[in-house]
UniProtKB/Swiss-Prot annotation:
Belongs to the UPF0248 family. It comes from the Archaea. InterPro entries: MJ1316, UPF0248. HAMAP family: UPF0248. It comes from Metallosphaera sedula (strain ATCC 51363 / DSM 5348 / JCM 9185 / NBRC 15509 / TH2). This is UPF0248 protein Msed_0897.
Length: 78
């Protein structure tokens, strides 16, 4: 499953979003965890947050549920 598919699956179900977070690589801060409720939408290239921040989808390293990794870029490489 691609990162986009996994992000959209979680968004579309809209259940328990507060249990999910996304770990991204920020060019200045390093690894940053973003709570899933902040994500407004996802397209093929970007993640759009509630404060108008736009994050390139290639910066996503992990998706976590209650702190446990459920998707990892390194584990899901093809």
């Amino acid at each position: 499953m691609t990162i986009k598919d996994e992000l959209n699956r979680i968004l579309w179900t809209r259940r328990d979003l507060e249990n999910y977070s996304v770990l991204i690589v920020d060019r200045f801060k390093g690894l940053v965890e973003i709570p899933f409720p902040r994500i407004e939408r996802v397209d093929n290239t970007y993640i759009y947050l509630d404060d108008d921040t736009v994050i390139p989808i290639h910066r996503v390293m992990e998706i976590r549920m209650k702190g446990q990794v459920i998707w990892s870029r390194t584990a899901n490489r093809r």
